[in-house]
């Protein structure tokens, strides 16, 4: 039995894509521990794997379990017991020698690595094998001894790009470089909107996260707006605004709907609604160009041979582009370095000018 854990839910269609492609690649009976099982059921993951709820239970302050876990944390300096109590459904039935794949991908790029480490130690104590699957890790994080200690415990690490691979190999010899599993995700072709221009659409993905990671969110938003204006005014292409994450509080549709409203009187622009990851890839694959913020939206484009520009904020976007093209210059625009709204448009012009060679 293959166990997949640290899955946040399929309303992040990148997470959904990782699960679908991983289960297909491994071709083994699989169990998915999900932090949002209802969303996985909505998008049909129960048809390919057994879904278990990874419920995080928070006990009232000064309850018995709270006192026990607080005492252990005070004495040992670790939160292992607290996490074991909170994540009972995940940790109660671990069988020795079973394989547990940590599928968060970029979980180590965000806060909360102490919880990840505690979950991993609890699994390892029961004799299971740990795999960090398709990951990206900012090299500077490896200056943190606690993160290094955690990563050393994995029996296998598959890094999805060379920047992370080169860093992780220095601390865990069981590190290999393997493409993100979502490159193998099949696409599902739905009927296209009536105003879809065959082989002449620019797919655009934007996210609240990319606005937050820029130096100024308004500059990032205006960069998207200026790009759309450029396409409508100076090309004969249509524009398809395509979401890839629809989580509460981090929903691409909120940004995309705002952009759509500014141009909705032009029949060459459309807003694609929410779909599962295979259906979204079906739309992306039929674009002529793609400009995206979400990693797995851009992976859908890359793997469909669609010339792609990434507005990125982390090591994963730079590393994947470097592995595909030899360098990330012109293929990735780091949002942190975006100073003027027209920079995104300038990068898109380069993409159009190099369409055939890409």
Feature names for model-found ranges:
Residues 1-358:
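Active-site anion-handling motifs in enzyme catalytic cores
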């Amino acid at each position: 039995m293959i166990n997949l854990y640290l899955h946040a839910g399929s309303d992040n269609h990148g997470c959904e894509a990782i699960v679908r492609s991983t289960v297909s690649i491994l071709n083994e009976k699989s169990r998915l521990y999900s932090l949002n099982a209802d969303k996985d059921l909505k998008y049909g993951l129960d048809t390919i794997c057994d879904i278990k709820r990874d419920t995080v239970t928070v006990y009232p302050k000064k309850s018995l379990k709270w006192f026990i876990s607080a005492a252990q944390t005070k004495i040992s300096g670790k939160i292992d017991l607290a996490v074991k109590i909170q994540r009972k459904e995940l940790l109660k039935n671990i069988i020795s020698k079973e394989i547990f794949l940590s599928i968060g991908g970029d979980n180590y790029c965000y806060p909360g690595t102490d919880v990840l480490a505690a979950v991993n130690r609890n699994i390892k104590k029961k004799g299971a094998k740990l795999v960090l699957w398709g990951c990206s890790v900012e090299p500077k994080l490896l200056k943190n001894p606690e993160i290094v200690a955690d990563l050393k415990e994995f029996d296998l690490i598959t890094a999805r790009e060379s920047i992370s691979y080169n860093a992780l190999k220095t601390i865990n010899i069981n590190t290999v470089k393997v493409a993100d599993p979502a490159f193998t995700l099949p696409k599902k072709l739905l009927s296209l909107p009536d105003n879809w221009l065959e082989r002449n659409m620019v797919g655009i993905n934007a996210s609240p996260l990319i606005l937050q990671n820029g130096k100024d969110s308004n500059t990032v938003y205006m960069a998207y707006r200026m790009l759309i204006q450029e396409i409508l005014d100076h090309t004969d292409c249509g524009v398809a605004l395509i979401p890839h994450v629809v989580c509460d509080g981090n929903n691409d549709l909120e940004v995309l709907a705002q952009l759509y409203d500014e141009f909705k009187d032009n029949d060459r622009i459309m807003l694609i609604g929410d779909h599962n990851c295979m259906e979204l890839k079906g739309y992306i694959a039929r674009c002529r160009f793609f400009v995206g913020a979400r990693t797995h939206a851009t992976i859908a484009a890359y793997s469909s041979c669609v010339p792609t520009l990434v507005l990125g904020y982390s090591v994963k976007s730079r590393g994947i582009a470097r592995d595909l093209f030899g360098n990330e210059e012109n293929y990735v625009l780091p949002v942190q370095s975006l100073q003027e709204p027209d920079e995104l448009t300038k990068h898109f012009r380069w993409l159009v000018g190099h369409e055939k060679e890409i």
